[in-house]
Amino acid sequence: MVEDILAPGLRVVFCGINPGLSSAGTGFPFAHPANRFWKVIYQAGFTDRQLKPQEAQHLLDYRCGVTKLVDRPTVQANEVSKQELHAGGRKLIEKIEDYQPQALAILGKRAYEQGFSQRGAQWGKQTLTIGSTQIWVLPNPSGLSRVSLEKLVEAYRELDQALVVRGR
């Protein structure tokens, strides 16, 4: 089981779709060697060094957290049903209401659209909020994603810079 890494006062909570088998096996988020999450958040400015999956708890030192929409591990995220994503979206709203980070970054358009019953999502900041928490949709850093490392870093950096401008 991959546990959430959450606390009050976070700048951002990154929300993956569900754990892959590597993460489920190790208990660490974004654990597959091909997953680019740790490299991306470092290069985008969220951390001052590239953390390893087993150092995930150190995200809190940078006022970052991690959660997921669905607990069930799968080989590929497309194995998660619309119903699971929708139910996960309701649970996620409760978590975010409890912790109220500055931003919630949903990693993937499908996750956002199906988890929050939205259509036609664009990358970046959304108009929908959860209380005072901004919602952002960012490309998924999975190794299965065709988005280049450069584009991932650019998208994540936009969020990091927006939070700096917001004074957080």
UniProtKB/Swiss-Prot annotation:
Keywords: Cytoplasm, DNA damage, DNA excision, DNA repair, DNA-binding, Hydrolase. GO terms for molecular function: DNA binding; pyrimidine-specific mismatch base pair DNA N-glycosylase activity; uracil DNA N-glycosylase activity. Its EC number is 3.2.2.28. One of its GO terms (cellular component) is cytoplasm. It is an enzyme of class 3 (hydrolase). It comes from the Bacteria. It is found in: Cytoplasm. The keyword Hydrolase applies. Pfam families: UDG. InterPro entries: MUG/TDG (IPR015637), MUG_bact (IPR023502), Uracil-DNA_glycosylase-like (IPR005122), Uracil-DNA_glycosylase-like_sf (IPR036895). It catalyses: Specifically hydrolyzes mismatched double-stranded DNA and polynucleotides, releasing free uracil. One of its GO terms (biological process) is base-excision repair, AP site formation. Excises ethenocytosine and uracil, which can arise by alkylation or deamination of cytosine, respectively, from the corresponding mispairs with guanine in ds-DNA. It is capable of hydrolyzing the carbon-nitrogen bond between the sugar-phosphate backbone of the DNA and the mispaired base. The complementary strand guanine functions in substrate recognition. Required for DNA damage lesion repair in stationary-phase cells. Binds DNA as a monomer. Belongs to the uracil-DNA glycosylase (UDG) superfamily. TDG/mug family. This is G/U mismatch-specific DNA glycosylase.
